């Protein structure tokens, strides 16, 4: 996480990816995968960020990070100019995780467009 905070996003991607590969069953693996996607987003590699967040959702469907991953996917889709898909992703987030903090943010975004 220090690498991410310092702006060394490529280093953070390598570190977090390595952790997930080495310790895929760790309780910290979903968070590490989440940060891979965040670092890719910070590098403006939006397609890779979407893929990484989808990987989190697929590998760790019961993780509390899933709602945040969906919010990040929608953000990346919007950055790519795919606003219709971003809105669908935000709605999916609200439908699946209505009580989450991420759903609150999704509702705000849906209301502002």
Regions found by a protein language model. Name each.
Residues 1-25:
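Alpha-helical segment of the N-proximal tetratricopeptide repeat
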Residues 22-28, 59-65, 94-104:
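Short solvent-exposed coil/turn linkers within tandem alpha-helical repeat scaffolds
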